[in-house]
Amino acid sequence: MKKKNVLLFFLFLSCFVFLSVSLSAEQMYSPSWGYALDLPEDFVLANREGNERYLFQHAILPVDLQIALYEEPQFKTAKEAAEHVFKQLKMTHKDVPFVWRNKEALLSSVSFLYSPSEKYKPKELSGWVLSLELPNKTGWLVLLTYTDKDKAKECENLMISSLDTVYTDTMSYFETGPVTTALYPKTKEKTIEYTFNNKNISFTIDESDAEANKSVIDREFSVLTMYLNHDNLIAAWQRFYKIIFRDAWNRIAPASFAVYTSLFDENNQNGFAEKAAKELLFLVQNFNYERDRKGSDFMNLPQALTEKRGDCDSRALLMVLMLKQMNIDAVLLVSPNKSHAIAAVDCPGSGTCFTHNGRDYLGCETTAHVPIGEIADEIAAPENWFPVDFYVIENFESN
């Protein structure tokens, strides 16, 4: 399939090509166009033309990803940019128009025939097209991912994951991905009455949030399992948590603000990080412990928060996310050999510390009623853990 799709790439060169990559093949940023991608592991750059057309091919599954960039005057809408591709490749398509980052966008399931020449029988291909408007009238970004029609179901999660992890501006790092936004639109906000720190608080959550976040978890878990016997499993695992974190950011933000308001005392700001960490740890430690060994074994974060239940992963990630939203530095620590996850926070205190990026983080055991810094001896060794870093808004303030 790879040779065939390199030919397909050149055949439609006026339609697709690649960008100025300043990071690895999986994590890319284009300084000239201002967008970024965090592709699943093992996508390899197979071809490019300038900084406008790229072809990536996956090393495990037969999936291709083509990227095309167009100057702003070429089209008036994201739909027009997508229709340019539909016409050139003679695609049949089913469109889902939606709004992402306050701009009209288009997601389309597509199918088309391809043959490198008349000597070859046309082959049926299936996939997805995502068309986005870049900020500041920079231009249009169109992504096409596809595979053989008979492989479409097997490869769908990988294809969707590659499209859903695109970033077009600073705040898009904290925004539900475009594909999830299109497929799981907001429905109706509801108010949650909640008890935190012996206080009654309330916050809003959308009725679609739990299902949408669960869909991301299930999809990314499916992608993650491809790497179980591969050298880059840890990198894939880190990406798994980062994508869930990103999707949940806006879904959890109203709750984090309510918690912050209940804790913050403008007349006594000293020790706020320690206070917030202790209270959030107490909250998640009192969740009901539940696991779903049949699936991803990970409770979606909106449901974990509102229903106060989940396992170590969901509790620890929820705690880290809420601390980050209060501008408190925290990391997720995951131990494959111990099948465990904990939060770790940069705040005053004593106990088991983990050093990461030159900082010391106190371990937070979310599934036992112990204070910050108390981690069981049998799992406390640093070599048992790998860290997961997340984007924070302050990282982009100087950009």
Give the location of each predicted region.
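Conserved polar/disulfide-associated segments of primarily extracytoplasmic proteins
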Residues: 48-142, 149
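Bacterial N-terminal signal peptides
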Residues: 10-18
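Hydrophobic/aromatic-rich core segments of domains that either
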Residues: 302, 314-391, 398-399
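Surface-exposed amphipathic alpha-helical segments
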Residues: 43, 143-182
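Bacterial N-terminal signal peptides that target proteins for export
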Residues: 2-10
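N-terminal "mature-domain start" segment
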Residues: 26-49
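Secondary-structure boundary elements
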Residues: 237-307, 367
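Secretory-pathway-linked proteins and extracytosolic
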Residues: 194-251
